[in-house]
Amino acid sequence: LWATVSTRQRPRSADWTPRANTGFIVLMDGRGARIAADGLGYTNECHVSPDGRHLYVNETYGRRLSRFPLAEDGTLGAKEVIAEFGSGEFPDGLAFDAEGQVWVTIIVADRLVRVDPRSGRVARMLDAGDPTHMARIEAAFQAGTLASDDLAQAHSALANPSSLAFTGPGERAAWLGCLLADRIMRVPMPVAGHPPPHWAWQEQAQ
């Protein structure tokens, strides 16, 4: 089992800067818990790739989608940056589709993007961003003054999308969890999702 810890800073907003580098990934197994990767830019959601070869993780304030090769004992190899995000874009949640592409939710910019792990190409699939809001948050981020109040107001219906999960017949829809919304949103998807590994646990147990 792998878990992410976003920051060692107190308050956590002290790491809401381009210099964020205190996040880490913890590996938990029969030998206990230990740090498997360190020095990351505000580690957020992580997932094992469908082929089981890599652990993918969003570095929210590092503004990167990164991955680590997985060894058989669960340890992680050297980090590889798959995609970097631009002004006003902060990656949060992620999920894989049936074609091995990575879907990433972007807070502040209120976007849903699809990343090709082979080329690093980022395709914008859903965009509700407010350019004025994005510019204001970007300025505070660069100045090292970004605070909770800056992120507390919704500027679109997506309202800071922080997670997604494929659902429905053929996995052709997705639920979006949004930090500032009072509901979970369901959107149609152009491609089927990849079933998460835990869906097969009961089958494996039998």
Which residue stretches match the model-derived regions?
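Blade-level signature of beta-propeller repeat domains, shared across WD40, Kelch, NHL, RCC1
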Residues: L158-Q206
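Short loop/turn segments immediately following the C-termini of beta-strands
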Residues: S6-R8, T60, L70, I107, ...
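A short loop-to-beta-strand structural motif that recurs across blades of beta-propeller domains
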Residues: G23-V26, R64-S66, R111-V113, R183-M185
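Flexible "stalk/tail and boundary" regions
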Residues: V26-G30, V113-M125, G129-T132, A139, ...
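Short loop/turn segments immediately following beta-strands, especially the blade-tip
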Residues: F68-T75, V115-V122, V187-H198
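Short, solvent-exposed loop/turn segments at conserved positions within beta-propeller repeat blades
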Residues: Q9-G23, T60-R63, I107-V108, L180
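Beta-rich, blade/repeat-based domains predominating
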Residues: L1-W2, T7-Q9, R19-I25, R34-H54, ...
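Beta-propeller fold detector
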Residues: I35-D38, L76-E84, V122-P131, A135-R136, ...
